[in-house]
Amino acid sequence: GVYTFGPRAEEAKIETDKAFQRRFMQDNDIPGCPVFETFDDMDAACEFIDDYDGDLAVKPVGLTGGKGVKVIGDQVTAAEAKEYIRESEYEQVVLEERLIGEEFTIQAFVADGDLRTAPAVQDHKRAYEGDEGPNTGGMGSYSDTGSQLPFMQDGDYEAAVDIMEQTVAAMPDYKGVLYGQFMLTTEGPKVVEFNARFGDPEAMNTLPILETPFLDVLTAARNGDDLPELDFSGEATVCKYAVPDGYPTDPDAGTRIEVNEETVGDGLLFYASVDAREDGLHTTTSRSFAVVGRADSISAAEKIAESALAAAGEGFHIRHDIGKPDLVQSRIDHMTELRGE
């Protein structure tokens, strides 16, 4: 047979079942778990919203492609959240405290209790510049020259890795990629969710700068050997997605994609959801392609990505602000304000 580097269905529940994920953290005393309750009675869930002193995140238990979560006080009102719960016909929902801070992701290779982590990445879920608009599968992301991001302090990255290590210790049979999405709060990192796979777009930030041969990691996992330590190039990266006009609410599918691959320059080009026809590639209703810039600073990497986007042609929406100095600085300022510094 063909060796597969990935968790079994039982371990993958850490992604596919959000109620399991929270109970697993609670039962194993894993730090970073927000206050939560699970409900299969939607009327009871709505009553909990009425009685709760503060804002909540509403999370359907199953997979929603990164677009099922609604946050009271950010995306919806309490009344809108209750309407969403009643009309969506989910079998079960998790209601948990709204986490305030800056999100980041750490991806890791896991096998036989070993965990090898990549640099932190920040994704941008909102569709429009300035973090406005509906949630998407991710409009782009960036990483810095080291393991942590500019808004993080010493120890924040290590605290998040410790949460992942304790998670793996409580799930010793887990093999594959473990994706930890965190909210950096004034109390340290809190777990937004775990995924049993690479992040999209975050994998496009980390894999191009991975200098340890990817095959060596898989071979070690297959053979039961210790996973090799991971070496990265030390470059900053910026990834930006080109999506169909109207994405995600009313995407314009069927537009011909005319990417001039010769003008991508130093950027990397990754096709995503495209429809291959006799006359070329066409958009679907999902994200079309991404470009990645790598350089010795976030700002320089952003310029490479932006230059590569000149190859995109017409009919696409792009968040040009991702990785630009003003947006990166706004993340730093946000955490500084929350910390009261």
Residue ranges and their predicted role:
Residues 287-295:
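Short, well-ordered beta-strand elements within core beta-sheets of diverse protein domains
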Residues 322-341:
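A cross-kingdom feature marking charged/low-complexity
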Residues 159-169, 174-178, 195-264, 276:
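Active-site "cap" helix and flanking loop/linker of ATP-utilizing ligase/carboxylase catalytic domains
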Residues 1-17, 29-39:
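A short, GP-enriched loop/loop-strand-helix hinge that lies immediately N-terminal to
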Residues 254-256, 302-309:
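Short amphipathic alpha-helices in soluble, non-transmembrane regions
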Residues 53-74:
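Conserved anion/nucleotide-ligand pocket segment
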Residues 68-198:
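Internal nucleotide-binding/catalytic subdomain
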Residues 90-91, 307-323:
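Short arginine-rich
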